[in-house]
Amino acid sequence: MPGKLRSDAGLESDTAMKKGETLRKQTEEKEKKEKPKSDKTEEIAEEEETVFPKAKQVKKKAEPSEVDMNSPKSKKAKKKEEPSQNDISPKTKSLRKKKEPIEKKVVSSKTKKVTKNEEPSEEEIDAPKPKKMKKEKEMNGETREKSPKLKNGFPHPEPDCNPSEAASEESNSEIEQEIPVEQKEGAFSNFPISEETIKLLKGRGVTFLFPIQAKTFHHVYSGKDLIAQARTGTGKTFSFAIPLIEKLHGELQDRKRGRAPQVLVLAPTRELANQVSKDFSDITKKLSVACFYGGTPYGGQFERMRNGIDILVGTPGRIKDHIQNGKLDLTKLKHVVLDEVDQMLDMGFADQVEEILSVAYKKDSEDNPQTLLFSATCPHWVFNVAKKYMKSTYEQVDLIGKKTQKTAITVEHLAIKCHWTQRAAVIGDVIRVYSGHQGRTIIFCETKKEAQELSQNSAIKQDAQSLHGDIPQKQREITLKGFRNGSFGVLVATNVAARGLDIPEVDLVIQSSPPKDVESYIHRSGRTGRAGRTGVCICFYQHKEEYQLVQVEQKAGIKFKRIGVPSATEIIKASSKDAIRLLDSVPPTAISHFKQSAEKLIEEKGAVEALAAALAHISGATSVDQRSLINSNVGFVTMILQCSIEMPNISYAWKELKEQLGEEIDSKVKGMVFLKGKLGVCFDVPTASVTEIQEKWHDSRRWQLSVATEQPELEGPREGYGGFRGQREGSRGFRGQRDGNRRFRGQREGSRGPRGQRSGGGNKSNRSQNKGQKRSFSKAFGQ
């Protein structure tokens, strides 16, 4: 009986194994039969996997491994997961048939062709292909929700808003990113400025506050004392004008007749006072603004005081006169502004300013008016003097600070070495090249006489007028208005036009000589390059003024680019451009009257020759003097002798010149100086000798000779009048003599020796010595 049971159990197990093998074989056969049909579906799945990379990872986790497939348990699972076609109910089959078209829609017609003929490439598989997907059943029975759109290869949820709103938001964000930081900080919305004032500011072209205006607004508006320093042309006037006007607008005012001013603004010049007054008037229609300065009748000013004044702008002299006459009451002052404070507190105005302010100020009183000091230059002594007018808790805003460059960063600084006898003619050429007939130029002179003479010099081809203290005030105002309006292009002025004047579109500023103090240079150069525009400032200097130029460089934190006078080529090129622009301004009605003459001229000379002659005559460049690029002397041409190695001394160049051109070249070469790095020299020769020199000279591997078209870069500025020199004029240091021998100063003949020693007499030596070291020392240090 037990044996029978064992045999029965063994038979049952054998039967079960046979059934399992039979079932496995049937399943494999069915898979082989279904494989061709499922190829296409698998390709669809692969296509979907490229679209949904995350789903592919889920599939891999869901599919069993080969090891699991071989185990009995896995076989049962597989059997359940993949029932045969016979086991599928008719209802399930019908559902599958309905969902098959949805799966087919996923694949584009182009993809279908690829899957039928060949397998897709790696690029096609890897490339993201965003598609709108509905819920669909995959081969493993999993369902997938509608897929979000892909953006840059990654899922990206659809926005709640419509596409036009999204695009507008993106464009707005881009615009915000493009707005400079200065405009964001200076936006009107950041400050308590009324809509009426904003409208008036926009009428002046102001759409946001400049940095100095933004950083000082709240200090001024809150009533704090302030010292502010910023570069020229950055909008310092509106820095105090806007907040003061808003403050007065917000206060209840008794606008009765004869009221005393609440704001006093003192300026050093009449022109600046007039300009500041206009700036106030342009941005307020409710307040009464008056401007008092010398050279104008008293009657009109008395009438303004009788009617009542809210804001008074003026120069110290006329304000002081009204106080002494008992006509002007300053006891009600709440705000005092000193514009260009360094000049207002200097020796020329200090006594007058103190007398004016003593009326409204009490010593060590917290009830004194609010004091506002503005300038582009604030030396240390200004702070010491200003403290007696300011409260102990004053604010300081400095947009220059410890920065090296004190001048406007939009101005290019150039320097031309020129003897005073040639200066007027060279200035005329400089205006042609750097400004032209259509541009505006301001020339600053040290004296009234020089300004008057230069404005009438025939070398300046453009219309020019002068502006200085000897001109009646009425004429000064007419002249300044004409220059602003473009009635003439060149203004020759003394320092009356140096400070504060905001003249639009000044292309060029010329200083006839280095100023005595660096503050004057900073303010003069600041007449160009204003409000973001670029400009050029050219300073003329003589050999004896080179030390002053170096001092300006060091104190103003700038570096002059030493240039030569404009060459004939540059002058003609600039003049022709001006002439062409002038042709555009000729009306068609005038042209018709000259057509017959033009046709006749073309027949005689040809079109090009006739037009070239006409342009030359229009430009005034019928004859252009050739000038030295080194010292501006007329009748000379500058030549460059380049050397392939660094020259030990200047006699090295003399030796080569004499070998090729003969000893007579000694009398023709003038003012030889080293090029940068001592890789050659440049010198002047008479214009008549240029052709002869070029014919005799032959370039070699070491030496090349050419005519200079612009001033080459020379071997460093000679600071303090010392160092090695290659010019006949000079100071202490070595000299490059004309005979080609290097000697110490004090030797004109004989062997090389110590300073002051000569083989040929002592008196001349002593005189030479005195002209050397002692003389240059006194020049350098003002002794």
From Swiss-Prot:
It is an enzyme of class 3 (hydrolase). Sequence repeats lie at residues 724-728, 734-738, 744-748. It holds the Pfam family DEAD. Residues 1-188, 708-783 are annotated as: Disordered. Residues 724-748 are annotated as: 3 X 5 AA repeats. GO terms for cellular component: B-WICH complex; chromosome; cytosol; membrane; mitochondrion; nucleolus; nucleoplasm. It is found in: Nucleus, Nucleolus; Nucleus, Nucleoplasm; Cytoplasm, Cytosol; Mitochondrion. InterPro entries: DEAD/DEAH_box_helicase_dom, DEAD_box_RNA_helicase, GUCT, Helicase_ATP-bd, Helicase_C-like, P-loop_NTPase, RBD_domain_sf. The modification Phosphothreonine is found at residue 296. Signal peptide: none annotated. GO terms for biological process: chromatin remodeling; defense response to virus; innate immune response; negative regulation of transcription by RNA polymerase I; osteoblast differentiation; positive regulation of canonical NF-kappaB signal transduction; positive regulation of myeloid dendritic cell cytokine production; positive regulation of transcription by RNA polymerase I. The modification N6-acetyllysine is found at residues 18, 137, 600, 779. Its EC number is 3.6.4.13. RNA helicase that acts as a sensor of the transcriptional status of both RNA polymerase (Pol) I and II: promotes ribosomal RNA (rRNA) processing and transcription from polymerase II (Pol II). Binds various RNAs, such as rRNAs, snoRNAs, 7SK and, at lower extent, mRNAs. In the nucleolus, localizes to rDNA locus, where it directly binds rRNAs and snoRNAs, and promotes rRNA transcription, processing and modification. Required for rRNA 2'-O-methylation, possibly by promoting the recruitment of late-acting snoRNAs SNORD56 and SNORD58 with pre-ribosomal complexes. Belongs to the DEAD box helicase family. DDX21/DDX50 subfamily. This is Nucleolar RNA helicase 2. It comes from Homo sapiens.
